[in-house]
């Protein structure tokens, strides 16, 4: 492996409580039925508007309106609910970068939010590509984020979402995430997946991944083969 693309929520950052609370606060603000913690957690990894559409029988336009409300509430909630990295994440990422792996990030978050957390964790110097939900037309489980990330890793000024420009990189690419959306994105792109069990997905949901780990530090063992 040479290229590694990481999810953020539930993989690098422990954000479940913040996301679930903000989803539920948004439901209250929009006079919607408040879904359970478990129901909300299952949508983590989807783009916000898609999360609301999946939870409620609503139109795409209504989903966008809910997403806008969510972002307003999120700005207040994040002041008191700090997202911390999971154990062994920071030191492992820095070790991989030092060892010569090319690292990228693919998250359904919008770029403003994602960049803020990357800077908070002081990780901006180790990622060659950061792809957010508002950077592509089709988010997870579509493969667009993988193709765009690899294009940026290659130094393309205007990375395309076609596999043709990066097909020689796919066999050397690993996607690391905590949800079935991440596994599906990897496989749709033509690369392999490693799932973490400490995030938002269950081991059963992640069974299709080539590797499953319980601790982020175990990634080093997988890469050493």
Language-model segments: which ranges?
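Short alpha-helical
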Residues: 18, 47-50, 84, 91, ...
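Active-site neighborhood of HAD-like aspartate-dependent phosphohydrolases
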Residues: 1-42, 56
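Alpha-helical elements of Rossmann-like donor-binding domains used by nucleotide-donor carbohydrate transfer enzymes
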Residues: 21-25, 50-51, 69, 91, ...
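Asp-based, Mg2+/Mn2+-dependent phosphohydrolase catalytic module
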Residues: 1-2, 97, 111, 116-225
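A metal-dependent, Asp-based hydrolase signature
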Residues: 45-77, 87-95
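Short, surface-exposed acidic
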Residues: 33-39, 58-68, 158-171
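Short phosphate-binding/catalytic loops that engage adenosine nucleotides
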Residues: 32, 101, 191
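Short, acidic loop-to-helix structural element flanking the phosphoryl-transfer center
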Residues: 76-105, 111-115, 143
């Amino acid at each position: 492996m040479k290229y590694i693309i990481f999810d953020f929520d539930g993989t690098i950052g422990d954000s479940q409580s913040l996301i679930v609370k903000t989803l539920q606060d948004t439901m209250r603000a929009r006079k919607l039925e408040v879904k359970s913690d478990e129901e909300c957690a299952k949508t983590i990894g989807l783009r916000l508007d898609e999360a609301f559409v999946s939870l409620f029988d609503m139109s795409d336009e209504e989903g966008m309106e809910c997403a806008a409300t969510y972002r307003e509430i999120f700005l207040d909630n994040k002041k008191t609910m700090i997202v911390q990295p999971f154990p062994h994440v920071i030191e492992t990422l820095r070790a991989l970068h030092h060892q010569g792996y090319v690292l990228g990030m693919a998250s359904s978050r919008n770029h403003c939010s994602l960049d803020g957390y990357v800077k908070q964790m002081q990780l901006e110097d180790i990622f060659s590509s950061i792809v957010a939900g508002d950077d592509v037309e089709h988010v997870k489980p579509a493969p667009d984020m993988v193709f765009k990330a690899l294009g940026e890793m290659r130094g393309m000024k205007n990375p395309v979402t076609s596999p043709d420009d990066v097909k020689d990189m796919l066999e050397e690419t690993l996607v690391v995430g905590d949800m079935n959306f991440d596994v599906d994105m990897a496989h749709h792109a033509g690369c392999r997946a490693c799932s973490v069990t400490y995030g938002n997905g269950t081991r059963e949901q992640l069974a299709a991944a080539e590797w499953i780990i319980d601790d982020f530090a175990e990634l080093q063992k997988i890469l050493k083969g």
